[in-house]
């Protein structure tokens, strides 16, 4: 009986959190940035450590953006599974892909923040977009994000996430 109460309590709690998120987080509009020569440069920054199984798909989706002024930077954070080799091969044939080899992490830094910091230092865009290596972008992700950032006074946007399972 106690397990039933715990289960019902958990469902009520998670339903409340979901409801609050639906209210607070607005989806990006389906509008695209109007054509102009003044589109800000966007840097898509991808920290990657041992992501050989997903990195090519991530990079490929990032490069297929319907936006004229962007670069993709991928930092190989000392991977041991072949991620660096895949990135070296891709950056050799793709112009706006920048492959960065991560530096040794200082003692007072954590791994992912250090990788993101290195990416931010190398990026040349006015807008920095950070994604994980297991993320695939829709072709209109960058235009929608730029449009949303220009329409509202915001310093960050959160995209719609499509998950394969409940536990993701």
List where the protein language model places each region.
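N-terminal membrane-anchoring/stem segments of glycan-assembly enzymes
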Residues: 1-36
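Short, well-formed alpha-helical segments that are part of the catalytic scaffolds
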Residues: 23-32, 51-64
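Active-site acidic Asp-centered loop
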Residues: 77, 131-133, 158
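Acidic donor-binding/catalytic loop of UDP-sugar-dependent glycosyltransferases
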Residues: 82, 131-148
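Acidic donor-binding segment of Leloir-type glycosyltransferases
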Residues: 59-105
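Cell-envelope/extracellular polymer assembly enzymes that use nucleotide-activated donors
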Residues: 40-43, 71
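Short aromatic/hydrophobic "clamp" motif used to bind/position activated sugar donors
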Residues: 116, 128
């Amino acid at each position: 009986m106690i397990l039933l109460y715990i289960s019902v309590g958990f469902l009520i709690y998670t339903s409340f959190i979901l409801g609050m998120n639906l209210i607070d987080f607005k989806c990006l509009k389906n509008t695209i940035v109007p054509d102009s020569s003044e589109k800000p440069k966007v840097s898509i920054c991808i920290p990657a450590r041992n992501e050989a199984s997903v990195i090519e798909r991530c990079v490929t989706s990032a490069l297929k953006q319907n936006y004229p002024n962007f670069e993709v930077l991928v930092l190989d954070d000392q991977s041991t599974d072949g991620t660096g080799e895949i990135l070296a091969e891709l950056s050799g044939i793709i112009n706006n892909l920048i492959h960065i080899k991560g530096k040794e992490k200082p003692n007072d830094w954590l791994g992912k923040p250090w990788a993101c910091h290195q990416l931010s230092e190398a990026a040349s865009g006015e807008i920095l977009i950070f994604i994980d290596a297991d993320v695939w972008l829709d072709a209109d992700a960058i235009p929608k994000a730029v449009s949303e950032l220009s329409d509202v006074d915001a310093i960050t946007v959160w995209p719609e996430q499509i998950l394969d399972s409940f536990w993701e």
